[in-house]
């Protein structure tokens, strides 16, 4: 046919058998990638420290998705929560990866079979003897089957009726585990952070899909609608399918970036808004205040703060700190976290407690400023010493640590105080191992950032694809210069324009 490279899909336009074949091959490629990627991640994943070196710090991308659906154990004898397991069963991480690879192989063989045996009776219109597809009927079948799968997932897998449940955690990402979830049928089901909404929405959407599928199987579209929406044209299917995909991609980009019950912070890392709003910092101070109210000492109160909670309150875990073109995991950036040094409390020579202003998300550098409880600047690390009034040396700032590895240790020499003031800009202070991975000290994004960027980008691309193919479908006659009621046989892609001498005409 002499088609240009970007017209490759035209060859399956009027060939239902091979259209099916290429879609099965596409499924084979997707499943094969998923299984292979899972095996690669399992080969490089270190499960030894789920608190300070969780999957999202290591740049794992497919392991979090398996985990949120209920997979927690490995055939290697480890569990994602840090324990050991003796009988992980078939549905371990490796089992899921293997299932995808086997499925990919079967799809590969099926694709070859359908490519070779393309001229099947099922694709033949008995009235004309030509290949054709009953697209409204196929739409009904797909809607019914996807509705069934959606309902089954919500009613059985998520609820634990037949399945493990899903990953559920507390608002601060400390106690997460896989557990069954009851559907939330009240208004709380619309809260994106309520796991019960996942069950109820899948049940409701699945029911709707089943009913809609049955409707489209039993009711034919009216002729005017059929013609108006070009329901006989396969490019209509392409256009509307692209619309469904880009819409879903925009939705999941939002739920990932802003956070939801479907994207737990234990699996994907915290969101940037939790840093911006001081979310974890407020909870830490609330716990410390509660401890002090129970007559605990500062040291005791801070020592009871979970290391996991303190680690979330560190800017290096903010997905918006990584540049778009900085490849690699968070561990390749600031290093592997080894331990929490403790919470630094700064005081001036008058005994006032000072607080270091934290670095906003989109700053790479930020002045070190210490303010008192009323927000008045009391000390800083000046850019020009000659004009300084509030330098650490002049104000006599000291630092004492509570909780963590440096619990009870205090420093008064200005060099050390300034060092910890700079580090306190970044949240809680951690010891980071940059030698093991040759980490360069430049922040990276978490899988939360990569997922969002990828899906938002492709959603935009697919949006234009929807417009393109939708317009081609609706205005095909205009673009081609062909009257839709013409009785000439026109093969799109084969002939450049009407009037081609090789165009066959139906016998009068």
From Swiss-Prot:
GO terms for molecular function: chlorophyll binding; electron transporter, transferring electrons within the cyclic electron transport pathway of photosynthesis activity. It is found in: Plastid, Chloroplast thylakoid membrane. PSII is composed of 1 copy each of membrane proteins PsbA, PsbB, PsbC, PsbD, PsbE, PsbF, PsbH, PsbI, PsbJ, PsbK, PsbL, PsbM, PsbT, PsbX, PsbY, PsbZ, Psb30/Ycf12, at least 3 peripheral proteins of the oxygen-evolving complex and a large number of cofactors. It forms dimeric complexes. It holds the Pfam family PSII. Binds multiple chlorophylls. PSII binds additional chlorophylls, carotenoids and specific lipids. The keyword Transmembrane helix applies. It comes from Ipomoea purpurea (Common morning glory). Keywords: Chlorophyll, Chloroplast, Chromophore, Membrane, Photosynthesis, Photosystem II, Plastid, Thylakoid, Transmembrane, Transmembrane helix. This is Photosystem II CP47 reaction center protein. The chain crosses the membrane at residues 21-36, 101-115, 140-156, 203-218, 237-252, 457-472. One of the components of the core complex of photosystem II (PSII). It binds chlorophyll and helps catalyze the primary light-induced photochemical processes of PSII. PSII is a light-driven water:plastoquinone oxidoreductase, using light energy to abstract electrons from H(2)O, generating O(2) and a proton gradient subsequently used for ATP formation. GO terms for biological process: photosynthetic electron transport in photosystem II.
């Amino acid at each position: 046919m002499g088609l240009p490279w970007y017209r490759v899909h035209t060859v399956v336009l009027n060939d239902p058998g091979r259209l099916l074949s290429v879609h099965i091959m596409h499924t084979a490629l997707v499943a094969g990638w998923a299984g292979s990627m899972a095996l690669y991640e399992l080969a490089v994943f270190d499960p030894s420290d789920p608190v300070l070196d969780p999957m999202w710090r290591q740049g794992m991308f497919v392991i979090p998705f398996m985990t949120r659906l209920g997979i927690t154990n490995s055939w290697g004898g480890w569990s994602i929560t840090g324990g050991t397991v003796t009988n992980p069963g078939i549905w371990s991480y490796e089992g899921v990866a293997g299932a995808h690879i086997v499925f990919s192989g079967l799809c590969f063989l099926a694709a070859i079979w359908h490519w070779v045996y393309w001229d099947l009776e099922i694709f033949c219109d008995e009235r004309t003897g030509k290949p054709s597809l009953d697209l409204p009927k196929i739409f009904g079948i797909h809607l019914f089957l996807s509705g069934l799968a959606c309902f089954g997932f919500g009613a059985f897998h998520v609820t634990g009726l037949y399945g493990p449940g899903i990953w559920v955690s507390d608002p601060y990402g400390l106690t997460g585990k896989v557990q069954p979830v009851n559907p939330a049928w009240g208004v709380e089901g619309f809260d994106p952070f309520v796991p019960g909404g996942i069950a109820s929405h899948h049940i409701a959407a699945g029911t709707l899909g089943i009913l809609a599928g049955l409707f489209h199987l039993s009711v034919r579209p009216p002729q005017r609608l059929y013609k108006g929406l070009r329901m006989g044209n396969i490019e209509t299917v392409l256009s509307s399918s692209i619309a469904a995909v880009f819409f879903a991609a925009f939705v999941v980009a939002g739920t990932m970036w802003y956070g939801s019950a479907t994207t737990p912070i234990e699996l994907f890392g915290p969101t940037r808004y939790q840093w911006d709003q001081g979310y974890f910092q407020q909870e830490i101070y609330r716990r410390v205040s509660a401890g002090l109210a129970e007559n605990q000492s500062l040291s005791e109160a801070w020592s009871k703060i979970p290391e996991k909670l303190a680690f979330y309150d560190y800017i290096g875990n903010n997905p918006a700190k990584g540049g778009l073109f900085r490849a690699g995991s968070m561990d390749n950036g600031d290093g592997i976290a080894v331990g929490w040094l403790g919470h630094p409390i700064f005081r001036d020579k008058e005994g006032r407690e000072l607080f270091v202003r934290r670095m906003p998300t989109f700053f790479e550098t930020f002045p070190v400023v210490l303010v008192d409880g009323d927000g008045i600047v009391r000390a800083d690390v000046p850019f020009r010493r000659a004009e300084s009034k509030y330098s650490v040396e002049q104000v006599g700032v000291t630092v004492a640590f509570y909780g963590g590895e440096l619990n009870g240790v205090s420093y008064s020499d200005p060099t050390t105080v300034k060092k910890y003031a700079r580090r306190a800009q970044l949240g809680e202070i951690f010891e980071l191992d940059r030698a093991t991975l040759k980490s360069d000290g430049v922040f990276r994004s978490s899988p939360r950032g990569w997922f969002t960027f990828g899906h938002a980008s492709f959603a935009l691309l697919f949006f234009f694809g929807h417009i393109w193919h939708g317009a081609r479908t609706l205005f095909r006659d205009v673009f081609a210069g062909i009257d839709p009621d013409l009785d000439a046989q026109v093969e799109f892609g084969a002939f450049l324009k009407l009037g081609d001498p090789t165009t066959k005409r139906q016998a009068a």
